[in-house]
Amino acid sequence: MESIPLRKKILETIVSKSTLKQKVFDNTFATFNDLKETLLEMASEMDDQLDGLLDRRVRLEYRDRGKFEAQIQVANALLIFQMHTDVFEFGSDHLIWQNPYVQADRDNSYCGLINIYNFLSDSFKFNRNADEGYLIGRIFINRERRYFAEGKQQNSMRAMDFGKSEIGQEALVAILESAIGFALNFDLLMPPYEENKRVTVDQFNTKMDNSKFVTGKRLGYDFDVEDI
């Protein structure tokens, strides 16, 4: 049976989109593995540099949590790096569409995503499931390993710089150091008194048994304009 024009177009789209997205995924996955190796090296180097300068209980600890997640604990801050398994295109109002590199070829806009979250380490240690964290950064990688970063203090490669450089270890170190620096200076805020002044005996006992008085850092996907 001969392919009708529409079917032919569908088949061509399947081939082109699948090839494009697979390339983006492969680049993002390779970058995430590079990120994990860089994190491990940074944690080891900084831990050695801190030796003798502070309590041994305050260390940098790297944890590999599988193919798509890694963590680094710095004092009471826990940074979680998570690679999304899907490939994305940007909304029509995103700044990326003003970038000449993307305007020259729409396929350049398809990106893989690595999220950077900031939590309190005790939230996981004591299973405080109600505690909140904060998305502090995102790394985007495309089919050509070109990249840019969004988030708090991520100034190394903005959306309008997308296409100028391939992501490598130097870029990863800059992104990771910015994320760690921000997390260390993002202190826990005291909850308002009015939100905590009344508690039942059952609530108190339950929370004490599980160390679950709600604390934490905010979680959200919205960045301020100056962060993008």
Model-identified regions with their sequence ranges:
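N-terminal, Lys/Arg- and Ser/Thr-rich interaction peptides
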Residues: M1-Q22
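Glycine-rich, aromatic-bearing surface loops/beta-hairpins
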Residues: L135-I228
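Hydrophobic-cavity lipid-handling domains and compact docking modules
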Residues: R56-R145, A149-M157
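Residues that form generic nucleotide/phosphate-binding pockets
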Residues: T13, K17, M42, I175-S178, ...
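Short, solvent-exposed secondary-structure capping/transition elements
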Residues: S44-D55, Q82-M83, F90-S92, L188-P192
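Short N-terminal edge-element motif at the start of the domain
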Residues: K23-E69
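Short, charged/polar micro-motifs that form catalytic or ligand-binding hotspots
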Residues: S18, Q22-K36, R158-Q169
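Intrinsically disordered, low-complexity linear regions
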Residues: E2-K9, D55-R57, Y62-Q82, A104, ...
